[in-house]
Amino acid sequence: MALTAEEKQEIIAKYATHEGDTGSPEVQVALLSKRIADLTEHLKEHKHDHHSRRGMQLMIGDRRRLLDYLKRVDINRYRSLIERLGLRR
């Protein structure tokens, strides 16, 4: 269920803005989106796992704040990211 090191490196390589980039909003949002997607699948099977549901809600809030920041700072990067990730906004 957790991200493996290989999966994490693939996501970082795909969304990095420059060499060695691991902390840009794009990378952080992409990693959170993968974790949220994995937890969503887990919760479909385990409906009463409220502890994981709470953790997922916190991750969704973190992602929302990062997206709001990116939208405020650079709207073009924001639009590009939500299109690449397939997010609704």
UniProtKB/Swiss-Prot annotation:
Keyword terms: Ribonucleoprotein, Ribosomal protein, RNA-binding, rRNA-binding
Domain of life: Bacteria
GO molecular function annotation: rRNA binding; structural constituent of ribosome
UniProt keyword RNA-binding, yes or no: yes
Pfam family, one: Ribosomal_S15
One CC-aspect GO term: cytosolic small ribosomal subunit
Entries under InterPro entries matching the protein: Ribosomal_uS15, Ribosomal_uS15_bac-type, uS15_NS1_RNA-bd_sf
Entry's family note: Belongs to the universal ribosomal protein uS15 family.
PANTHER family, sorted: RIBOSOMAL PROTEIN S15, BACTERIAL AND ORGANELLAR (PTHR23321), SMALL RIBOSOMAL SUBUNIT PROTEIN US15M (PTHR23321:SF26)
Subunit structure: Part of the 30S ribosomal subunit. Forms a bridge to the 50S subunit in the 70S ribosome, contacting the 23S rRNA.
Descriptive protein name: Small ribosomal subunit protein uS15
Organism listed in the record: Bifidobacterium longum (strain NCC 2705)
